[in-house]
Amino acid sequence: MKSYLKFLLLSLCILTLASCSGEKTTQSAASTEQNKKEIIIGTTVGDFADMVRDQVKPELEKQGYRVQLLEFTDYVRPNLALADKSIDINIFQHKPYLDDFAQSRHLDIMPAFQVPTGPLGIYAGRMHELSAVKEGSSVSVPNDPSNLARALVMLDKLGWITLKTDINPLKASLADIAGNNKNIKLVPLEAAQLPRSRHDVDFAVINGNFATSSGLKFTSALYLEPGYTYVNWSAIRTADKDSQWVKDITAAYNSAAFKQYAFKRFAGYKYPESWGIQATQPASAPAK
C-alpha cells in the first residue's frame, strides 16, 4: 500500500511539473511574440514594395523594429511564405483572392488592413481604341481565378462577351461565358506577364500594381474597373492578430504621413475604405 501511495504521489508531482513547464513555455512564446522586433514583409514588385521602402519601413524603424522586405513576382508564393512563417505579413491581394486561396490551401491566414490599390484596367495592345474591337480580337487576362473573374466582368460590361445571369460575379470563370458574338480570343497569363503581352494581343487586362511597375499610367487605360470590392488587403497569420507589431504596422499604414504620401505618390489609386476618401472616379464603360 505504501509503495502504491509513493507511486501515486510521484506521478502527481511529475504531472504538476509538466503542467507548469507547459504553461511557462506557452507564456514564453506569447511574450516573445508580443516583444517581436523584427518584421519580414512580403509584397509583389512595384507599388506595394515602394510603400514599404518609402514610408512604412522608416516609420517602424523609428519605433525600434528591424524591417526586411521580400518582393515576389507571382500571386502564390506570398501566401505560402506567410503560412510557413518565412514572412510575417504580405501585401498584394484583394479579399476575394485571399479568402479563396486560404480555403483551397487550408491556410490559417486572415486579412488585417487595406492598402492603396491601383485599379484593374484594359490597356491598348495592337489596337488603341475600345471601338476598334472586331471579330476575333485577342485579349490577355490574368490566369488566377479571382482576377480572371474581374476581367470577365469587365468584358461583359463592355459588351464583348456575355456572362450567365445566375452566377456569382466574384467567381466567374470561362465556363460562365454564355455568349461571345465577336469571338473574342482570351489569352490567360500570369499577372506579371500581362504588361509585356501587349505586343502580342489586341488588348490587355492588367492589374494596377503590375501596370505601374511597368511604367503604365492609369490615365492611359482604355477602361478602369469600377467599384471598391478589390481594394487590396494585408494578410497575417491568424495567431498574430492581437500582436503589438500588427497594431504598429497597421498604424503606420493609416498614419497622416502615409496618407499624404499616398495621395501624392499614388494619385488615381483606390484608397482604404476606412480613410473615407477616394481621389478619382473610374472610367465609364461605353454603351453596349
Please provide the spans of the model-predicted regions.
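C-terminal motif of bacterial Sec signal peptides marking the signal peptidase cleavage site
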Residues: 15-19
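Bacterial lipoprotein signal-peptidase II cleavage site
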Residues: 20-30
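A conserved helix-loop-strand patch within extracytoplasmic ligand-binding domains
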Residues: 112-162, 259-260
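A bilobed periplasmic-binding-protein/Venus flytrap-type ligand-binding module shared by bacterial periplasmic
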Residues: 119-130, 230-245
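Periplasmic-binding protein-like
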Residues: 149-156, 253-274
